[in-house]
Amino acid sequence: METTQKQIVLGILAHVDSGKTTLSEAMLYRSGMIPELGTVEKGNTMCDNDPLEKQVGHSVRLAVAHIDTAMPDLTPVRIHVLDTPGYSDYLGQDLSALDAVKSVAAVVDATQGVEMLTRRMMQAAKDRNLCRMIVVNKFEDPNADLVGLLKEMQEIWGPGVLPINLPTKNRTRVIDCFDRDEGDADIMSVEEVHRAFIEKIV
């Protein structure tokens, strides 16, 4: 019996230099779609392959990539990743991407906090009733105030903002707070965050 492939379209959005393209590249690499992890600095990422993008070091157009994977029940899934530019000059491309997706991931630079374009795009995603998630980038930076950042995000987007993952004490790895209820985290209590998720689900 032929199995129908599930299609997911995910928009990656954020203010410029927050790490959208780096996240997209990491997703492609970890899923086995590309053999080597490129970097924006080297100009060899899948999504920033335009000569101008390589020259200026950031996205200037909407890029599309895809990831082939499977659900836990082995149903095949193709995830279409839309990497948005992140500059106000290209806001039209960012907004048009929202019309093609069901979910968005907003990348927040832990050293900079929630920036203007990220707020604007998340509001636009909310207005379209899209599923929204937040990816905190550069959390390993010792100068990143993670407690302050979480408070800022909750003030902007509400108390429902909870970390699914918490950084370990040395900030080199993360602890999955959804499946686990114990661990030595750098901020907050894994047990308390896990309990908060369970209460929301129940």
Positions of predicted regions on the chain:
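P-loop NTPase catalytic nucleotide-binding module
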Residues: 1-18, 36-37, 56, 76, ...
